[in-house]
């Protein structure tokens, strides 16, 4: 059965399984989450530092969850390589746009 998390661009069965193991069961569970903290928790759970690309996927996933009409460019995980999410200074990112 396909996970509801697989609707997130760039998230397949394996990444959805990681998200679920961290207690994220649906897209809305990502709203208000800190991608850096989710990445840290993933690394701790696995017992090693996961590739930084996983951090970029977390950033894209949280962005997707928080923006009903997302900028399509920002749905690519590689967009987030050199960009933090939420952008610095944006305190209430869950209410952005």
PLM features: what roles do these ranges have?
Residues 1-11:
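Sterile Alpha Motif
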Residues 6, 17-25, 32-97:
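Structure-specific DNA junction-binding interface
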């Amino acid at each position: 059965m396909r996970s509801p998390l697989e609707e997130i661009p760039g998230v397949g069965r394996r990444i959805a399984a990681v998200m679920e193991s961290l207690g994220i069961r649906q897209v809305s569970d990502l709203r208000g989450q800190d991608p850096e903290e989710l990445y840290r928790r993933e690394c701790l759970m696995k017992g090693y530092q996961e590739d930084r690309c996983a951090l970029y996927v977390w950033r894209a996933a949280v962005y997707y969850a928080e923006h009903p009409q997302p900028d399509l460019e920002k749905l690519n995980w590689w967009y987030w390589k050199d960009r933090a999410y939420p952008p610095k200074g944006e305190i209430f990112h869950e209410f952005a746009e």
